[in-house]
């Protein structure tokens, strides 16, 4: 267990914003989890759980508490199709491991930044797959009850980019130590999600093995999304919008695409509002994918907040819809 003091939050998050954290503790073993929490408790400091920082925004005032960095590694088979993966593993490394074993279930989650421990928190998903489709349970440390617990999928209240881990009274209560998933030997078959289907048709792909799907998804994602080491970004910055039937009909009458489940792609809204490539207070809307906000020159959270509010206002005036931020704020 490594304890560091006065650490720059911008060096822990991919948007590269944020002041100082009082303490940052790197967790390398399961035993470190309880020790680190007790350290925070003894110092009467709040705790924030962080993985790679790809879905977290730091604030200018920093964090006067303890950031716990989950770096606990390990992947093991429980049986032929069931895997336990430790929370500090990179999600993409887990996807690579499973596709090499020709197992299906998470191959479309390739190239999503972040850790295994963060996957259930956000119920991460892409190209028609979501972690809840394969998730069985998580092993976690309950910061409130100060004990290790196993939480089954049906008790996680999983939804679109949400769970008990980031919503409601239990948000931030659990540090996910490991995740158990159950995969399959079945493979995905066409038709696929729009951009993946277009790729298949353009390149006349006939191999739909997990490894092949992973290769396609990775190429598509990196053709659109900035790599964190090259550009400061949190990936998709706005959530897609879900509507009731009446609102969905209103949007259809405006020739706005409404997908299955009355989902409206926020990227389309931003693009068709003419915001692609536009800069606001040092933040730029990506030319390749309108959902992406890139930190070009913003030096503070205040700049990001101003940019976000201006984009949200433009979309509200044009479509009557309110965009919601996807990354959580460190506070």
State where each predicted segment sits.
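Generic non-transmembrane alpha-helix signal with a bias for helix starts/N-cap capping motifs
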Residues: 33, 91, 263, 308-309
């Amino acid at each position: 267990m490594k304890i560091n003091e006065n650490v720059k939050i911008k060096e822990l998050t991919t948007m590269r914003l944020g002041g100082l954290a009082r303490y940052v503790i790197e967790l390398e073993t399961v035993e470190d989890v309880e020790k680190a929490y007790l350290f925070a408790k003894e110092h009467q400091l709040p705790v924030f759980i962080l993985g790679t920082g790809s879905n977290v925004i730091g604030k200018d005032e920093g964090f006067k508490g303890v950031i716990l960095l989950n770096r606990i590694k390990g992947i093991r088979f429980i049986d032929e199709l069931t895997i336990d993966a430790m929370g500090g593993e990179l999600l993409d490394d887990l996807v690579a491991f499973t596709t090499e074993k020709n197992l299906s279930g998470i191959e479309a989650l390739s190239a999503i930044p972040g850790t295994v421990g963060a996957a259930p928190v956000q119920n991460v998903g892409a190209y028609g797959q979501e972690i809840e489709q394969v998730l069985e349970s998580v092993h976690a440390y309950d910061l409130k009850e100060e004990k290790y617990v196993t939480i089954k999928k049906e008790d996680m209240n999983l939804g679109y980019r949400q769970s008990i881990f980031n919503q409601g009274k239990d948000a931030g209560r659990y540090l996910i130590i490991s995740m158990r998933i159950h995969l399959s030997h079945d493979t995905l078959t066409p038709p696929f999600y729009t951009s993946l289907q277009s790729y298949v048709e353009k390149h006349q792909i006939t191999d739909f093995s997990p490894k092949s799907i992973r290769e396609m998804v990775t190429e598509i994602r990196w053709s659109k999304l900035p790599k964190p080491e090259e550009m400061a970004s949190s990936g998709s910055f706005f959530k897609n919008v879900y509507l009731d039937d009446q609102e969905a009909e209103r949007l259809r009458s405006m020739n706005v695409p409404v997908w299955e489940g009355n989902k409206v792609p926020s990227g389309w809204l931003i693009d068709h509002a003419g915001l692609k490539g536009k800069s606001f207070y040092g933040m730029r809307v990506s030319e390749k994918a309108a959902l992406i906000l890139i930190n070009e020159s913003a030096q503070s959270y205040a700049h990001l907040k101003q940019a976000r509010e201006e984009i949200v206002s433009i979309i509200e005036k044009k479509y009557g819809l309110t965009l919601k931020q996807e990354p959580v704020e460190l506070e």
